[in-house]
Every structure is written in C-alpha cells, then in structure tokens.
C-alpha cells in the first residue's frame, strides 16, 4: 500500500518527539525516505501537513508549472518549501517536531495522525475531534463530487451501474 490511511493518536515526549505510526513509516520508507516531510497547511485549520517524498515531488512539479516570478508562486513556495521540514526517523520510529510547526498547530502533549491518501495530517486531538464532527455533517453533500470521478474509474466499454 502506498497511501496514508487510518487515524492514530500518539504522545509527544518531553523532548518534542512523537512516534510516527508504523503504517505511515512504511509508506514513506517504501517511497525512499527514512523519515517524513512536514509543512504548514494551505487550508484553514490548526494542523500540520505531512507526506513522503512522492507527494513532496508532486508539490515541486506543481510549483515548477507556475510563473517563477509570480507573487503567488513565491508565497506558495515560502509556505510549502521554506517552512517545510524533513524529519528523519530515529531507531524507535520517532521524529522531532519543530517548534514552529508545533506552535502553528497548537500541539502540546498528544497528536492525532490522520491519513489522507498521498499525504496525512497531524492534529491536536481536540481540534481534530471538532473538525471530524463538522466533516461528518458535511460529507454527505460531497457525494455527487465523488460520483463525478467514477467515469474515469470505469474500464473501457465497462458497464457499471
């Protein structure tokens, strides 16, 4: 499996280290990095975005498609690259979360890792609980959006329902 899935709660120790879920470590290691890459989110919310090298390379490709002298590219690069951190796993599968990212997400003693396919999020548990309630309320309205992707998933000449 090459995607981040599931929800895991882990403690931050007194040195700012947190154990990355084994399944998340396996995804990043399979992509060639004995660590994870973390950066501030582009959407509203107090959490940290995380990924392996595959998604990080996709971010680089997206930025490369933008005008290299545009203000938007500069701002995106500042957040996605300048504020990012490559965090290597220690022998116990832990990473040291940088202070700037911990403060941004309001992380103190516990975090929730939430899989999101090619990337994942690291939340303060209370903030994630509130987000999850709101997501459960709103996601039924997104059904048509998800259904609109079905055409590209059906095999040629393929029937479907």
Swiss-Prot record:
Q: Using the chain's own numbering, where are the disulfide bonds?
A: none
Q: Which GO terms describe its molecular function?
A: DNA-binding transcription factor activity; transcription cis-regulatory region binding
State if tRNA-binding is listed as a keyword.
no
Instruction: Name a single GO cellular component.
Output: nucleoid
Which PROSITE patterns does the protein's record reference? Answer: SPOVT_ABRB (PS51740)
Q: Pfam families under this entry? A: MraZ
Compartment annotation: Cytoplasm, Nucleoid
- Every copy of the SpoVT-AbrB domain together lies at 7-55, 84-127
The cross-references to Gene3D superfamilies, in alphabetical order and at most eight, read: Transcriptional regulator MraZ domain
> Which keywords annotate this record?
Cytoplasm, DNA-binding, Repeat, Transcription, Transcription regulation
The UniProt entry's GO biological process terms, in alphabetical order, are: negative regulation of DNA-templated transcription initiation
Q: Which family does it belong to?
A: Belongs to the MraZ family.
The record's note on quaternary structure and interaction partners says: Forms oligomers.
Q: Which HAMAP family match?
A: MraZ (MF_01008)
Q: What name has this protein been given in UniProt?
A: Transcriptional regulator MraZ
């Amino acid at each position: 499996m090459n995607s981040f899935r599931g929800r895991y709660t882990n403690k931050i120790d007194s040195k700012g280290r947190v154990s990355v879920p084994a399944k998340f470590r396996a995804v990043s290691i399979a992509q060639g990095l004995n660590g994870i890459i973390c950066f501030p989110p582009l959407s509203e919310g107090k959490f940290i975005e995380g990924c392996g090298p595959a998604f990080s390379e996709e971010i680089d490709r997206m930025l490369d498609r933008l005008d290299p002298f545009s203000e938007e590219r500069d701002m995106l690069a500042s957040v996605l690259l300048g504020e990012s951190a490559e965090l290597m796993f220690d022998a116990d599968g832990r990473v040291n979360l940088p202070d700037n990212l911990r403060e941004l997400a309001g992380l103190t003693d516990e975090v929730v890792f939430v899989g999101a396919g090619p990337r994942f999020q690291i939340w303060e548990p209370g903030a994630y609980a509130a987000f999850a309630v709101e997501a459960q309320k709103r996601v039924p309205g997104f059904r048509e959006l998800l259904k609109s992707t079905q055409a590209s998933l059906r095999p040629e000449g393929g029937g479907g329902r």
